[in-house]
Amino acid sequence: MITTRTARQCGQADYGWLQARYTFSFGHYFDPKLLGYASLRVLNQEVLAPGAAFQPRTYPKVDILNVILDGEAEYRDSEGNHVQASAGEALLLSTQPGVSYSEHNLSKDKPLTRMQLWLDACPQRENPLIQKLALNMGKQHLIASPEGAMGSLQLRQQVWLHHIVLDKGESANFQLHGPRTYLQSIHGKFHALTHHEEKAALTCGDGAFIRDEANITLVADSPLRALLIDLPV
């Protein structure tokens, strides 16, 4: 079953220095029916103005994945670690209790645009505090997984996350690990097909909940960039 969540249905924020779109309840935006999906707690697309920053703050025990779409960011923690990431890279922070984290748009004249996901972390798992990955702009790229398969970032949760880039008319098929998946369009138009021949059309910024499907096929109706988040738990 596919249930779409269009960009227009998402929460919105504009603070001047920050513009944001929230898939799930976040900050001032609250919907009791949308507190997350399985272990996916947050899925935001945010634009930080030139020179803007998120001041240091602590987090619940989550893995925070930032996919940089445009610009360059710097991340610091209270333990003295810091790393930079730019467009075409993904950065994973394995947050720790009592440690604060900040984010800064390094450019003085260019906005920073990124997708940010929070995933519940298994308390028994301890992974590297910071991991970075260059995105392969090919058809399919596994960018995060529980065991760091195929050179992907290693998560503290049973989640598989794919970065998808398709030309118009191309398709990609995914075998899913469990009953829940979330699909997020970054840009482009496409349709998703299930083995029950259910079809859903999505465009730039739209998302979709996928339930109880063994596999899913994506067909690009225009040049497409998207994320597929396979969430068995």
Swiss-Prot record:
Q: What is its main location?
A: cytoplasm
Induction per UniProt is: Induced under conditions that maximally induce expression of the large pathogenicity island (PAI) also called the locus of effacement (LEE).
Pfam families assigned to the protein according to its UniProt record, in alphabetical order: Pirin, Pirin_C_2
Keyword Coiled coil (UniProt): no
CDD domains named in the record: cupin_Yhhw_C (cd20311)
Q: Which Gene3D superfamilies is this protein grouped with?
A: Jelly Rolls
GO CC terms in record: cytoplasm
Swiss-Prot/TrEMBL keywords: Cytoplasm
| SUPFAM superfamilies, per the entry | RmlC-like cupins
Assembly and binders: Monomer.
What is the similarity comment for this entry? Belongs to the pirin family.
Q: What is the stated purpose of this protein?
A: Does not have quercetin 2,3-dioxygenase activity.
Q: What is this protein called?
A: Pirin-like protein YhaK
- What is the species of this protein? Escherichia coli O157:H7
